[in-house]
Amino acid sequence: MLLKHALAEYLLEIEIRKYTPKTIRSYRNNLNLFVRYLTEEAEIDEVEELTLAAVRRFSLYMVERGKKGTYINGLLKTAKSFIQYCYEEGYGGFNTKKNFRWCKEEKPVITAFQTVHVRLMLASCNGYGFLPIRDKAILSVLFETGIRCW
């Protein structure tokens, strides 16, 4: 079966499963990129020709284009779902529940407050009324536990 026909059926399937419109749009965009890579770069037109090596080459292709690990893993998650659907429907592909590798994601670095800034924030809660004491208590909890409010 042609990849574009399998893709159309898969998109119909996720609409039937009542995925949100935003999710469907995201899957459509991600899978169009994946299928375009397969047909133009890897010269794979049939689902039967799809292999794990082709998916890994797609991952490398995205890394070489400077994409971040989080973005690549989002694409791979969508591609994995599509390939598993094709496999279960008997169109071809492979079982993605084995040997599917993810891209390494960068861990975010959270910068800590400097002591001067902490003192200034606590000093801004001056007074003995309800609000200054409450604000100082909230800041103390946030600083002591490392909780981040975004």
Language model regions located:
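Conserved catalytic core of the tyrosine transesterase superfamily
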Residues: 1-150
